[in-house]
């Protein structure tokens, strides 16, 4: 599923028209249409956050929106992660170490559970 298809699906499930969503976001309906058709990709965090807010997405759905946006722009990192990664040397080191040692999904899940358990 593409970024635009995901937005369209969520918008329709909430019974919001394309024009209605565009108005709530303060953008032109033609721009919103281009986003849904995959002709344009709003990789600005603010717009993605506003889309998630207007569509009342869960945190998991919001994260999926970030990831789909990054996938549409090949080689991009999700806009919600870019600033964090670039401002945290340890995060960059951890990611590079995981890459170099080919960390498995199981290892990543164990790491996530360890972090959650410490909170």
Which ranges hold each PLM region?
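Short alpha-helical "recognition helix" segments of helix-turn-helix
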Residues: 19-22, 51
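DNA major-groove recognition helix of helix-turn-helix/homeodomain DNA-binding modules
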Residues: 46-64
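Interfacial/linker helices and their anchor residues that mediate assembly or domain coupling
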Residues: 70-119
């Amino acid at each position: 599923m593409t970024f635009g298809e995901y937005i369209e699906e969520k918008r329709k499930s909430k019974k919001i028209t394309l024009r209605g969503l565009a108005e709530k976001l303060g953008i032109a309906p033609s721009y919103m249409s281009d986003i849904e058709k995959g002709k344009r990709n709003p990789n600005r965090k603010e717009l993605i956050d506003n889309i998630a807010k207007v569509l009342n997405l869960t945190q998991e759905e919001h994260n999926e929106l970030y990831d789909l946006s990054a996938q549409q722009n090949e080689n991009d990192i999700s806009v919600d992660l870019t600033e964090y990664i670039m401002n945290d040397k340890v995060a960059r080191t951890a990611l590079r170490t995981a890459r170099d040692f080919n960390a498995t999904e199981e290892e990543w899940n164990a790491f996530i559970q360890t972090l959650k358990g410490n909170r």
